[in-house]
Every structure is written in C-alpha cells, then in structure tokens.
C-alpha cells in the first residue's frame, strides 16, 4: 500500500505541542485558564459530570488545595479542602495533568499522585471531564460515533484485508473502525526465527531486570508475560522494521505514519514488546482489561499512533483473543462507561499465525485469556510524523523505560486496584 486516499478521515488528533508549558501554579490555573474554558465548555462538562455521578475531589498541589465538585449551577472549583477525597500532586505533575502529558491514571500508576485507592479512583474518574472543560472534548454520549461504510451504508466490521489489495477500502475501514486485520503478512520462516529469539529472551528474563512484567498461573508457574525492548533481542524483528511489507502498514492512512513508539512513553525510536499469555494465568498483567494505549497520557500531543500486533500464534478462543471497541478512538470515554457497557460494538478479532492486527492508539481494546494453548504476539508500531518544534519532551529514555517497567509492579496496581487488576475472562 502506498499512501492512503486523501479523502479518508484523518486520525491525527493532535491539538497541543509536545513541549507545551502549563500554569505556574494551581492558583494561576484555577482562576485563569480553567475559568476561561469553563465559561466556554462548562454546560457540556457539567452534564458529563452529572452523568458520571462524580464525587467531590480535592486536588492538593504542593500544599495549595482546590476542590472540584458538582454544584447547583454546574461544575464548581473552590479554594481549600471541601471533599472527603484528596489527591496530592507536586507542581510538575499538575502541569503534566493540565497539558495532558500525563492523565490522572498515568500519574497514579507512575507513583506521582498521593492518595488512597478511593481518592485515586475519583481522580481518574474526573479526568475525562477535565478534558471536556479544558479541551472541549465532551464525554461520549450514545450515538456520538456512527460507523459508516465507504458506500454510505453500515460498516461491515467483519472485513479482513491483505496488503496491496483494496487499499481505499482498507484505509476507510481503519479510520472509521479504529482497527484492521491484515492477513498473511509474514512468512512461517520469519515467525519461526522471531519465536526462537523470543524463547531465548524469555529464558534470560529475571524479575528484577527492569525489562519485563511477570505473571503466574494457578499452578504457581511464574513467567515473564511481557518483554520490554524486545527489538534489542530480536535481529529478525529489526530487519522487518525496514521491510517494505512492514512499512506499507504505516502507509495505509494518509497521515504519514512512520515506525516509532506507540505505547505511551513516545520514544523517538521504534520499539517492540514480546507478549506471552499462558493458560490459567491468575496473577499479574498477562492480559489487560479494556484500555486505550493513550490512557496514561499524551493524547492531544501524539494521537493517533498505530499499534501493530505480529501474530506468532493464532488469535482465537483457544489461544486467547483480542477485542476492539469499534469507533472508540473517536470518543472521550470514561472508564465507568466502559464498565457499564457502551452502544459501540465490541469486535473479537480472529487471526492466524503470520497475520497482523492493527489498532489505533486511541481505540479501546482488551485481550482475553487462552483456554487451551499459549498465545504469543509481538507488538510494535508507528507514530505520526513530528510537527515543527516537536521533540521528545518526557525526559530521558532511561527514566521512561523505568516508568514503563514499573507498570508491571504489583505494588503500583494496588494504588488503583479496580482499574488495573485482571478480570476473569476479559483481562
């Protein structure tokens, strides 16, 4: 595929510079930019907060407290502590929140927010409404996202594609649905080579290596369920990064995607992660519940990237599946809405070895546990081209790698148990 149809919907949602600066203090923000945007977007945001039934929440920034609450005339923010739930941030974390460099979830699991689990839950629940006020991205309402085919009729969500065939239809489908399945992209020999390198990396991993997440089965088998920086351990994968077939995936859409890091830290170079999901896993993050790859932050600076899954085993009920919420990349969706159920269709992808799954970084997706056979997949991706003045602004790669590795730390998950703990049959 060489360049998408220019008439296809763009997935470039960037509205903020990577090096965006924020307020000098919490007082300056709440009395200035917040008040200004509340005057513009306040009615919609108040309705969003009401639908989500958000509790009062105090945000303390370096000792200066302000409280968010639903008042009689919309969302109110009051100086001082006026809530039973309080989260604490330093000024740098608060600036990252306002700029969306990090979301509330990203700050909580990154150990940059202090609060008990209930306060952290409330903090994360308020986050979509903060975006509704600050950026005008209203929280999703039923019917907001129609799924329309290229012919104007309902979009057929069961479509499968091959590179070089039906290019316009593939581009339309990916932009509309937020995912696509590409059949028979890589050969058995290539997959065998990656599988062998993956096995070596699994055997070499250790709990404290800073490059792996660990899980355990009900039989007590502890294993590395996710190998970070797998591209460093797989020469075959590094060769594929320059292969025309791989590069063609980034050309499906007209937005200029190029190999990069779609996972949340936004490194300047291409990265990969090797995942294995063993039967009977009961501890750890072998599988993740519904989430977006931008859930931890950066949506308005980086989205939408493309997350690429190279299937080393089939994706099916036996090996474990991949579900995607069609159209979810086009909406600001609160976690509570996902838990209650959306009117958007959840599509269970079924793939063979050598197929490639693609989903946008803003698309809600989840993996499901294997029933009888281990699942193995390598995830890598594409990012949008940098804009003038853009640069990696999240700190050194070493620090970012440390932050990513810490997600697998079970003590971090305890900060927000309901958000991150695997759930039977759907994590």
Residue spans of the language-model regions?
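Feature captures hydrophobic
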Residues: 2-165
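Non-heme Fe(II)/2-oxoglutarate
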Residues: 332, 358, 363-427
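Non-heme Fe(II)-dependent double-stranded beta-helix
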Residues: 152-176, 183-288, 410-412
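Hydrophobic beta-strand signal
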Residues: 114-115, 181, 358, 379
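Catalytic core of non-heme Fe(II) oxygenases with the double-stranded beta-helix
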Residues: 248-251, 255-258, 280-350, 389-395
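Histidine-centered metal-chelating micro-motifs
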Residues: 94-95, 295-296, 362-366
